[in-house]
Amino acid sequence: MQSMPDSTRHPPLSYCKAGVDIEKAADLVEAIKPIAKRTRRPGVLSGIGGFGGLFELPRGYKQPVLVSGTDGVGTKLKLAVELNRHDTIGIDLVAMCVNDVITTGAEPLFFLDYYATGHLNNEQAKQILTGIGAGCELAEVALIGGETAEMPGLYRQKDYDLAGFCVGVVEKEKIIDGSRVRVGDALIGIASSGPHSNGYSLIRKILARAKIPLSQSFENKSLADGLLAPTRIYVKTIKRLFSEINVHALAHITGGGLIENVPRVLPSYTQAVIDSNGWEWPAIFHWLQKQGKVPIEEMWRTFNMGVGMVLCLDKKEIRKTLELLAALGETAWILGEIQSSSEEQPRVTITP
């Protein structure tokens, strides 16, 4: 008969010895509380640390519709880990969620985060969460909850992952779903800050092949600064537009670029015809294409190419919209127009 192993030879085990430090996690929760407090807005009914975040719907809505969105930052996180720079990656996380929610016509209300790592490093975590708080302030949303998961053995020592969750509200009759888009409508692009949070698996492959240090100077700053520039948050700008412009549709340009994202808000039998001469690609995209010998079609299908958000509206509103965007500090231009199409035609045509 097989004997049982002698457990007396080994010291007692604990959760901490298994790799999960509950006290460190509790300290982090305390550090998050002042960050969340800075994002507080009307409607928040609870603080950080409870089992659920409470938020009261704003008054004045006749038929309020809740809009939810969730997203992550992708492999841009790997660059942050390699460079040990975590102060802006939280802004990226918030941006990816709130920019999606605002495209429906909704006002983003509150945000929650999920932070998972193999070994909890509170200094690293505080940088990340401070960035999340900064993003929430920029988007005027409340940080009302989240989850920190320390999972030894699942992630390498310094690696971590992030996910964000946002909820907004819109009056039912004011939902923007593309149904108002008409042939002849104008498309206006609002500038991005760079690649934002998409295409980084290709970017990292290009960097590995080129063997160029991220400390290298690029456009009066380091290449690292250019690639880690946080995703633009368009919420304040778009909310102002809603008050003055009849916006027919909005597309947040993320993974898949203009090619994949603009069709998501177009009715059947329409296509977006985009004039690529309407704007100059930011230098980082020229650099990436050259270093990686990336075909032009792949560039359009992977990156935002300098366009972070696309607006669709009546041509009569072009001048007013561009003037308002300029007054709000945005760089914007006429991107193209909506034309009729057949099922066989592409949903987006980019003219040289």
From Swiss-Prot:
Lineage: superkingdom: Bacteria
Cited Pfam families: AIRS, AIRS_C
Pathway(s) annotated for this protein in UniProt: Purine metabolism; IMP biosynthesis via de novo pathway; 5-amino-1-(5-phospho-D-ribosyl)imidazole from N(2)-formyl-N(1)-(5-phospho-D-ribosyl)glycinamide: step 2/2
ATP-binding recorded as keyword: yes
Keyword annotations from UniProtKB, A to Z: ATP-binding, Cytoplasm, Ligase, Nucleotide-binding, Purine biosynthesis
Cellular component terms per the entry's GO annotation: cytosol
Keyword Phosphoprotein found: no
InterPro entries: PurM-like_C_dom, PurM-like_C_sf, PurM-like_N, PurM-like_N_sf, PurM_cligase
Single Gene Ontology MF annotation: phosphoribosylamine-glycine ligase activity
Reactions the enzyme catalyzes: 2-formamido-N(1)-(5-O-phospho-beta-D-ribosyl)acetamidine + ATP = 5-amino-1-(5-phospho-beta-D-ribosyl)imidazole + ADP + phosphate + H(+)
Class of enzymatic activity (EC top level): ligase
UniProt EC number: 6.3.3.1
Biological process terms in GO annotation: 'de novo' IMP biosynthetic process; adenine biosynthetic process
Subcellular compartments: Cytoplasm
Family: Belongs to the AIR synthase family.
Protein name, per record: Phosphoribosylformylglycinamidine cyclo-ligase
UniProt organism field: Coxiella burnetii (strain Dugway 5J108-111)
